Amino acid sequence: MTSEDKTALCAENILNDIYILTINRNIDIDIIQEGLLRKVMDEEESNSILFLEDSSFSKNDISILNVHLKIEDGKNKYNNYYEFKYADINVTIDFYQKECKYSIEKSNMHKCHYFKMMNKINYITEQKMDFKDSILYLYNTINDKNFFKCPCWLNDNKNIKLNNIINDHQQKKKKKNLYDKSVQVTNDVTNIMVNEIQEQKMKKPIFFDNKNDLNNSDDEFNSAHSSLIKINKLLNVEENDIFHNLKGHVYEEYFDKHEDNKNQKDNIESNIIVKDKKDRANNIISEQMKEDYIKNVEEVLSKHINNNKNNNVEDSVSLYSLDEEISEQIDKQHFFSIDKRQDEISNFIQMEENINDHMNDNINKMGKKKHGKENRVVEDEKYIQDDKKKKRFYRNVNDNIPLTVQLANKGNEICKEIIEMNSRYYRDFFEEKILGCGGFGYVMKVKNKKFNITYALKIIRLSNSKYNTQTNNKHINEKDNNSYIMEEAIMIAKLQHENIVRYYDAWVEENVDFFLYKELQNEFKNIKIKIKNEKMKNEKMKNEKIISGKIKNENIKSENIKSENIKSENIKSENIKSEKVKNLYIEEIKYFWNHYKKNKDPNVNDKYLYILMEYCPGKTLREAIDCGFICRNEKLIWELIKQILKGISYIHDMKIMHRDIKPSNIFLQITDNILIAKIGDFGLTTRIGDTQINPSAGTIHYISPEQLNGEPFNEKADIFSLGVVFFEMFHEPFSTSMERSITLSNLLKGIYPEYMKADNKKFQFLSSLLAINPQERCCAYNLLHESVLFTFEKDFTDIYNLIDNKRNCEEVHTIISTLFDKFEYLNSDKILKKEDFSTFQNAKIFTDDLEMRKKQKIIKKKILISLKKRGAIFILTPIILLNKYYINLENTYMEEYNIYYNINKKKENKINNIYINTNKNKNIDNLIYMLDIYGNSITLRNSFFLSFAEYIYESIDSYNKYNEDNLFYKFYTYGYTYKNQIIKSNKHIKKDTINNNINTTINITTTTCNTTTGTSTNNNNNNNNNNMGNNNIGNNMGNNVSNIISNNNINNHMISNNPFYFYNIYPDENEKMFYCILSSSKNVFGNEELNYLSIFSNADIMVSIYTLYNHINYFNKLLFVWSYIDLLEIILKECLDIPNDISYHLSIDLKKNSTLLVNKSFVMSLLQKYKIKDMSKISDHILSLFYIKCESNKVDDYLNNIYNFVDDLLNKKSSLQLKRNTSITPKEVPYVRSRSNNISTSASKIIKYDIQKNVGTKEKGNQNDNEKKKMQIYSILDRIKKINNFICTNTVINNTCFDLFLNYEESIFCNEVIFYVICESKNKEIIAYGGRFDEIIRNMANEVKYKNHANYKYVYNNIKDIYNNNNNNNNNDNNIMNIKAYGVEIYLDKIYSKVIESNEKISIHLQYNPSTDKSQLFKNFVTSCQQNDFACTSHIIQQPLLNDDYLNYSSTKILIQVYEISNLLIAYDLSKKLLTKNISSYTHLSINNVNIKKKIKNFKPHKIQFFITIKSNNTDNSFDALKPINFDNVVYKIVNYDDQDCNFMDQAELINYLIKYF
């Protein structure tokens, strides 16, 4: 590398410089924005947040670094508040401009240090120093001890001049405030003491007769005045002021005659001067010094009492002497020193004045460089205004400190007791610093004394609650306002969200001075009573000790008696000391209260609201915007907007409006290296819908237009404020406040800058936020969940909500640990043996491989990118489809395949399946159907053509609202489709076995399409080739239908009677992508767009892949879909000609009153409210229908009676009786005997109908209608019978499972195939398959197109009628007829297999043949979180597989065992109710009644905690479809995993028991 390359500004050089610099342990460098890493790392491996569209900085030319520089040990250590400890330098590296920009974090730095550092940074910028040299230069600068000496703090050795200035300022202030008070106090005390002494002289005139006594009296008088002098010293009044007020030569002579007293006076003066020089924060005096001094004073006092004759005068003088001596020693250091916070504020004010010129000079220099002279003046004025505002605020806070708190900090025990009893704030929290202020109060950073936790505490002064008769209404309003504020505070305290500043608690306190004022009014009676009680208690204890001592020790020595007397004297002296100290505290409070009251109003009636909040140590969004960093990082802006929207959506869901959304109220906090935005400062919050709010409240430039106009508003006002914030985040920092005001004011008028309009994505989002009309603004939820910008996170949000709602679930803990625990992938070199695959011959064997997963993901991603570049929109299509569009309910049959049947032998791996299936043809109308738990007919998604057709049909109006001719849309999706897999047997079967198998196949069919055309077996073989022909739009529809039906019959016969075929247990899963083009009939772009090369030209899909997934754990997973079907509504509608809307409600009323339908009159009463014609006849029919009962174990007989009832009823309706061409002959065929010994020979019987129709016979309309209605009801009855037989066959044996699934062939779209086969050499495999499918959409417009057709002619005529009457429909079929729908399915699994073929590095030693790639496991069709699983098998716990894996029962904790079919609905009802309580269950139907306690052991590995069995109380276990279910006529037996069991008769008690457990 050349020298130029080493100094060039590139990512590699910057990383090398970072590595070299961080070797120094005092330099830490963090990469904040990953643009630097993107320069040296592959783009695919980046873990950054990706958005749908990249911004203009998508090349990541900008990188942000944070450089943390520390001071070396031993340097710049002055142990002072303003000590410089470290510096945070923000470095912005622009690789495109080839420059570095430096800024410094000033929040933790003194102003003097900040200005000096800015000068150094300006020097670096001017000299254009490189990155490494710049950081080293700054590091050496901060370690220069002389350079960073701050002139703002005091040093004992230096800066004497500044020290004297501050001391003079403080002394003058004290003299001014206390001079007048001291004069008044001095005169008052002097007069009192002189009067007392004169009164004593009047009583004792003998003292004037004796000169010595007179001198003694003068000494007492002088002693009193010396006490007065000391008292004034305690008041911080200088001695000269005292002597000017106390006139008389007596005091001068006193100090001249008595040298000791004069020395004492000098010592007091010197002590006061020294006290002013020392630190006034030192407020602690040793308790031992207090006690020693008080003892000495007591000794002097006792001697003085013994020597003098007049006890009264002596006590009075001694008392004053004692008081002033004790008070002087106790409070010499701190009684009248300035409070610590007051001292800091005064020092801060003085320092601001001293360095004001220095700061202005720096601002002027910076202003000249950036904005010129005009901008410099504006910034100068702004700084001065902010500075004055800050000073004013600190003075106000200092003035509002309660007197009780000030005295308590100085050591006043009475004030401490008042705070302890009445103030939670001052009792539980330390004040650290002020964080900010506002119109409602200020915020203080506090720390809990007990738990040492830091909080932010907002203090709001409430309105004065004092009653005033003249302003009665005003104070009532203030009271209401206070209650309103309290309600809002409590409401806000309930909010808890990741993106909202947490509000922990709120409470109201009286001003603590209010309680001090009450004590003053009561003259401290409570305190005095407390002192008196303590004195009495001590005396009582002393007397008890003396009495007990006399009883026990009658012969006590004199020395012991003396010791007892000494103890009693000590107790007495302690009482005296305590009482005197309390009196001094009281005098102190009285004096300061008078001083406090004269200077300002104490406002003792004020109340304060305290709101305890989460402390966010980071910055606000306002600071991030002003520094100019955030506007360059578009991805960060979108991420922050998303988080803010989440917070706003949450508070709106809680029916709360913020009303003050602005950047300064949004806090940025870094937690675990993740930037989180939190909404705070809910000062203007109110409930949504509150009409008693001030519309104009808020911050200018951020309030909505409706607020400015004084109109009613709702939560959409917060959305407008967010729009202004969003605009500021993208806008560069404003140079002046005037520019900011003009730009933001234009937003209210709908005027936006041109650069914002240029970006369509940003402008559309901003327009949705700043719409002038509130109704046109989007709500927070829609912006977050329905906006294109955030829709890619829907799945993540659903998963997060699921995990968040079920935090205590064991599976959720497993998911979290799996996702976030560190683990290593171990590559195993084991070779799979060929015999290991024998058990899984019907399933693909996959192995785990991390590299393969990555490459498959890359393949899928590249195909998706190709589709996105073509403008396709991603749409989710359902797995389960509605069969009302596709199924033919008549073309159903049931068949059972028993291969290798031998009644005397039981062999493993035998296949015994029962299918409820449709004809195995290629007609799109004859697909497999299933019944869900609600009785709806459904099918699995067998192709994306059908799922997209259903989606388009249901939602076409939203895409083509105005029936436009230029309709053109492109969609794509990916997922799995399912079809039945037919496997060909390789072994020949004996003829007898074949015949037996054919005889056991039972078909229930109503289709006899006997059209014969020139078709043969070759038709089936050549079907794919015919399907891949060119577009054949003009083909004759009748011929197509004829060919389809003919081929269907041949295929049915071939497959159902060919022993070489059998069905696989599970449907085949195919992972696919689907690309769809929807265009109008006049638009010709569809054919051009749907081209293979245009789709795959940009996708390099042939990538090396050598292994596939492992899904062995899902082997033999069971799914059972079951339902009960009610015929009553259909019979009322089809047989009795009752309208649809009436038949539905009437059927409900009849079922509710089924037990009361005993006579015709009651039925007539039910029919009267529906106004039905022929009410008498209909009542007779309904009554006869309800007379048909279902007896025990005779469900088939009951269904036969229903058959006869419908047949007779429809025959009677027919006005013209013709000779029936259709003969229906019921034949009872015994059900096939199964291999299990548990099967009863009296099993259910299936009714077989052979229906033959003559196609050439012409029937009249009314007879044809009756036949169609009859066939429809018959088909539903067949379904009910087959479901009943399916559940009650009693053929549940080993290795047998019952699944309802579908049959699907690849070549159903045979008319217009556009996509062909991707060929390599001679191997042809369908990878992409497509065609037109708008005909399917048209067919959906008429649900009865293929329903109930009696013959081929009916089908043909029906098709013609549909095509002829399309233009007459009034529904969305008008839109459907104007579109063309093209689509292509891409088989991802086959693409993977092609890649495997082309890859020579196959890691597994198994020959892989793509043609044998048949079936996959039923792995991706799983029930949703709001649906339970049902199974039907005798062995729920399967035998362990080769890898010792068991079935995975997901999150199921409860298994419900059912033995009778009649209790299956009860089990379903129980599971549904448990699911509403977030308790999932697995329902199992089995006749194998084994000991439960033995079974429960098998469930321990599956984490199933409860095993519930449901048994009937009575012996009648018949299934009566019309009889209401009695949920309490069963016994619920529950066993836990510890083999503890109990029984419940009531379902509610059982559910409560389980809820308590979970």
Curated annotation (Swiss-Prot):
Active site: 660
InterPro entries: CC_SR_Kinase (IPR050339), Kinase-like_dom_sf (IPR011009), Prot_kinase_dom (IPR000719), Protein_kinase_ATP_BS (IPR017441), Ser/Thr_kinase_AS (IPR008271)
One Pfam family cited in the UniProt record for this chain: Pkinase
GO molecular-function term, one example from the UniProt record: protein serine/threonine kinase activity
Disruption phenotype: No defect in erythrocyte asexual growth and gametocytogenesis. No defect in the production of sporozoites in the mosquito vector. In blood stage parasites, phosphorylation of eIF2alpha in response to amino-acid starvation is impaired. During the asexual blood stage, increased in parasitemia induced by host melatonin is impaired.
Induction of expression: Down-regulated at the ring stage by melatonin.
Cited SUPFAM superfamilies: Protein kinase-like (PK-like)
UniProt keyword annotations, A-Z: ATP-binding, Kinase, Nucleotide-binding, Phosphoprotein, Protein synthesis inhibitor, Serine/threonine-protein kinase, Transferase
Gene Ontology terms describing biological process: negative regulation of translation; post-transcriptional regulation of gene expression; protein phosphorylation; response to starvation
The UniProt record lists the keyword ATP-binding: yes
Catalytic reaction(s) noted: L-seryl-[protein] + ATP = O-phospho-L-seryl-[protein] + ADP + H(+); L-threonyl-[protein] + ATP = O-phospho-L-threonyl-[protein] + ADP + H(+)
EC number: 2.7.11.1
GO CC annotations on file: cytoplasm; nucleus
Domain Protein kinase stretches: 429-789
Region (Disordered): 1014-1033
Residues involved in ATP binding: 435-443, 458
Modification after translation (UniProt): Auto-phosphorylated.
Domain of life the protein comes from: Eukaryota
Reported function: In blood stage parasites, phosphorylates translation factor eIF2alpha in response to amino acid starvation. During the asexual blood stage, involved in the response to the host hormone melatonin which is used by the parasite to modulate its cell cycle.
Family under the similarity heading: Belongs to the protein kinase superfamily. Ser/Thr protein kinase family. GCN2 subfamily.
Protein name: Eukaryotic translation initiation factor 2-alpha kinase 1
UniProt source species: Plasmodium falciparum (isolate 3D7)
Gene: eIK1
